Structure formats: C-alpha cells, structure tokens
Amino acid sequence: MGVIQTLDGLMNNPTPEGRVDDILRPEGDNPLLEKGFVTTSVDALLNWARTGSMWPMTFGLACCAVEMMHAGAARLDLDRYGVVFRPSPRQSDVMIVAGTLVNKMAPALRKVYDQMPDPKWVISMGSCANGGGYYHYSYSVVRGCDRVVPVDVYVPGCPPTAEALVYGILQLQKKIWRTQTIAR
C-alpha cells in the first residue's frame, strides 16, 4: 500500500476506524500501521535525538587530554558522530574525565558535574581516571573518579588511544539508546 493510496483512503474516509487503543496492539494486528501511520514512543524519540547530539564537557587533567583532543581533530572527527565539545558545563550533557584526579581537584569535578543539566553521563578515560593508574598509591590521588561522580563508561589504557575514546563514545550512545529517559 503506497503513500498516495493511504492519503486517498484518508480523504475518502476522514474518520479512521482505529482508536487510541490500537497503538498498544502488536504490529501485526495494528490497523494504524496498515493505513501508513508510524507510531513510536516518546522515549525512543528522545533517546534517538540524544545519541545524535552529545555535547561533552572536557575535563582534561593529564596526558589523556591530548588523546581526547586528537579524537576531536580532523582524522577521527567526532563531529560526524554528533559530538561537539562545549566549554561550559551548562551546555553539555556528557563529561569526559581524562587523567589523574587528585584530592584537591575532586570538589571542582563534583561542582562541574552538578552544574550539568539532566540527563547527564560521564566517561572515565584512562587508567588514572579509572582507578588511580600509575599513581594509585600516592596519598594525593583519588583512586577512580567513580568515587566522586557516577561513571557510565570506562575507557581503559595509559593513555588510551583516540580510537578507544571513539569506541567508548559509541558504547555510551548504545547505553543512551537503551535508557528509559522518562523513568530515569
């Protein structure tokens, strides 16, 4: 059944036979789908929009930040994934923590996280951000940024390559796609 036939059928019969309850039926029994209507949930629509427009707040603390800049450069070009780096936490929905988090910087990290609008996600990039890394036994290092902010995706490596960060961003997009946004 083509679009023209569907429009022609609607013009001849302006009141469709389907009711609101027809949306809840399985796809095979749904008369709205047979007439050419597409139904979706608000969750799926919002998650689709969020996966295509992730705006990360960069929180580069050490050498991993260089790889994060490399991922945004021309060779990998995160713009084609809808990732645009933002300088302000109020404009971003993703925070990339890249590098060694020390005790003095932990309150600043939490403050930036609290300033981000909901829903918000965090990517922990590198061994130092994941668990302290090389400086794990130092008295001044936080042993993982997940002790300060909730982390959604961990990117391993010392430093992780830019390709690993892109893979982590793609994994976060998959996680956002599966999230129930309204119930979150």
UniProtKB/Swiss-Prot annotation:
A GO molecular function held by the record? NADH:ubiquinone reductase (non-electrogenic) activity
Q: Name one GO cellular component term.
A: plasma membrane
Task: Indicate where this protein is primarily found.
Answer: membrane
Q: What is its EC number?
A: 7.1.1.-
* Record keywords, A-Z: 4Fe-4S, Cell membrane, Iron, Iron-sulfur, Membrane, Metal-binding, NAD, Quinone, Translocase, Transport, Ubiquinone
Residues at which [4Fe-4S] cluster binds? 63-64, 128, 158
Q: How does the record classify its membrane topology?
A: Peripheral membrane protein
Q: Which domain of life is it from?
A: Bacteria
Instruction: List the cofactors.
Output: [4Fe-4S] cluster
Q: Where does it live in the cell?
A: Cell membrane
Example of a GO biological process term: electron transport coupled proton transport
Q: What does the record's cofactor remark say about binding? A: Binds 1 [4Fe-4S] cluster.
Keyword Nucleus recorded? no
Reactions the enzyme catalyzes: a quinone + NADH + 5 H(+)(in) = a quinol + NAD(+) + 4 H(+)(out)
Determine if Chaperone is one of this entry's keywords: no
What name is this protein filed under?
NADH-quinone oxidoreductase subunit B
